Design a protein with these regions (language model features):
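Short, hydrophobic/aromatic alpha-helical segments in well-folded domains
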Residues: 14-17, 33, 116
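Charged alpha-helical initiation segments
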Residues: 1-28
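Short, hydrophobic, well-ordered secondary-structure elements
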Residues: 19, 24-47
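Flexible secondary-structure boundary motifs
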Residues: 42-88, 136, 140
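Generic recognition of short, well-ordered alpha-helical interface segments
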Residues: 13, 29-32, 59, 66
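Charge-enriched, short contiguous segments at helix-coil
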Residues: 78-148
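Amphipathic alpha-helical interaction surfaces
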Residues: 40-48, 70, 97-100, 104-107
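Short alpha-helical segments used as structural interaction elements across diverse proteins
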Residues: 14, 38, 69, 92-97
């Protein structure tokens, strides 16, 4: 394994955990790992492209939405990749559905019921399935474009 062996092993473990999490109904774990993969690939691309570390003013990594905004600034006309007409928009749409799912298990407006567990699990399963496909495409895109 050339280059960063630890990164390779981390990714191998991440993909394995995504698979196992989905097989066992732990969709939030899969979604969290997918976000980590997508963020890492965006950070890697932007650091190579812009030549700087992507840290906020308080020396923390930028939020997922902030990363997407910076990524979009590199591709103002969109980003065709694989079967996605605009990969950046697709990632951002998934981010929104991910946020909804992450908070949906117990969060509700005061006085309103939370959604049913069955509906939550259905939405979480779908977000994990979609997130895996998107994370794979972001990885594929990153491999092709990081060297340019």
């Amino acid at each position: 394994i050339a280059g960063n062996a630890n990164k390779y092993y981390s990714y191998r473990e991440a993909w394995s955990r995504i698979r196992l999490a989905q097989e066992n109904g732990f969709y939030l774990e899969a979604i969290a790992i997918q976000e980590s993969i997508i963020s890492d690939r965006i950070i890697n691309y932007l650091c190579h492209k812009q030549g700087v570390a992507l840290l906020s003013n308080n020396n923390h990594f930028l939020s997922f939405s902030e990363l997407i905004i910076k990524w979009r600034s590199e591709f103002p006309n969109g980003l065709l990749s694989g079967s996605y007409s605009n990969l950046i928009d697709t990632v951002n749409e998934w981010r929104l559905s991910r946020n909804k799912v992450i908070h949906a298990i117990v969060k509700s407006k005061p006085g309103e019921q939370t959604q049913s567990i069955d509906l939550f699990l259905e939405q979480a399963k779908e977000a994990a399935k979609v997130g895996e496909a998107i994370a794979r495409e972001v990885c594929n895109w990153s491999k092709k474009n990081i060297r340019k």
